[in-house]
Amino acid sequence: MSVLVDHFDVFAGGFWLTFQLCILAATGALLVGTLVAVMRISPVPPLRWIGTAYVTVFRNSPLTIVMFFAAFGLPALGSNADFLRIPGLTSIFSRLGIDLPYFRFAVIALALYTAAFVCEAIRSGINAVPPGQAEAARAIGLTFGQNLRYVVLPQAWKSAVVPLGSVIIAMIKNSALAGFFGVIGDLSNSAQNLTSALGEPIIPVFIGVSIGFLVMTVPLGILLDRIERRRAVAAR
Amino acid sequence: MTERTEAVEVAGGTTTGEPLIRLDGVNKWFGPLHVLQDVNLSVARGEVVVVIGPSGSGKSTLCRAINRLEPINSGTITFDDRPLPAEGKALARLRSEVGMVFQSFNLFAHKTILENVTLGPVKVRKEKPAAARDRAMKLLERVGIANQAEKYPAQLSGGQQQRAAIARALAMQPKAMLFDEPTSALDPEMVGEVLDVMTSLARDGMTMVVVTHEMGFARHAANRVIFMADGQLVEDAAPDEFFANPRSERAKDFLSKILTH
Ligand SMILES: Nc1ncnc2c1ncn2[C@@H]1O[C@H](COP(=O)(O)OP(=O)(O)OP(=O)(O)O)[C@@H](O)[C@H]1O
Ligand SMILES: [Mg+2]
């Protein structure tokens, strides 16, 4: 187990990069997922179709394939995902700004894939809002967008937050794939390096990597349990 | 089918010429169910029209058609001389001019009573929040629940919630108000407080379409009573006339049922 001590900096660095990947992908997934959910319930049929098609594709494709398309398809299309080199953001998440695009590709793949599940969690939250709420909002003259923003979504979030948390936990675990698609120095890529390049023993290395993921997922899970329990008490 | 009294000469109502709400040959189907059958109705400014009829006769649908919460299949509905616009900004604007009060209150559950009342004025009418707040407090005072302003809907009694819902509708300064069985979800002891607010609105000259089974309200506050059955307007008469002398069998039958208990 000495590898955990000897290469603590590698694990810590891998954790930090995976953490950044997860923060960015989760943010993107929440934004895109909310947008797609709104499209799916919009009164405009073509928007609904696009939303439904999006969810159908991304919910039913293996993440590996989505990662593959991002890592090899985007460059083939001539994109280095430079739109993610957002000034300001790159100073916090320095990997976003570098020339090597694989971190950006991983963010995109993970965010787009997770967005389909975020969409469905939000949609179930929207469906849990009594229809009278939206109706009353329409009756006082709120437009579709205002209705969502001020009446429906704030209430939908409440019942969506626990399923959303589960989606994000799944996303954190899924982020382990990034190391196999060109991202250097995240938790899974660090593990590969330590075992194949440096010949460290496999089991302790993967225990270290597991701890890295558990540090992110377990607190989130506990938080969700808390929220759920508080809800249950409030509902009584 | 429709027997309408030409001029409206009743119950101390002040009504003027051009109708504010007008339905011409309105038909509405839910699948095979013909819920509104060739409905013609006009409601003058300042007029209070009570709609009664057996369950399932289409009263709610009629009420909801007027602000297009329920789209119709044929015919025309005009409000304030304009045909109802299709879904979109113009319809939202029209809806803001027609207050609606629901059986189940439908107050925004995540907002305080005060926020419920100011949301429309601030977001739809772009009023200054402080001004909207002042006006909202006056309205809450008017309906007698100013001291509940900071509470959430679930913390109020049914009667208080319904009065808050009326205040929310009034905050938009509507040209007309639609009420769909505003007191049927209330415990009996709270019905009076809501009817009092509605009666005072009627006195102040608000144009109102009220679906209700409160015959006392119909007698005292309405200019006209409309009796609906199976999607048709079967009778349209002054309250005194209607209650003393219903013309159709359906109406006689209905009245005998609701007035015997
Ligand atoms: N969204 C809907 N889809 C299908 N059928 C509907 C819908 N809304 C109402 N109906 C049907 O249309 C008919 C008229 O309904 P409506 O609610 O207008 O009646 P109502 O006179 O208001 O009855 P109540 O006194 O019970 O409120 C009923 O038979 C009802 O079942
Ligand atoms: Mg009804």
Language-model features, listed with the residues they occupy:
Chain A
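Transmembrane alpha-helices and adjacent helix-loop boundaries
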Residues: 1-236
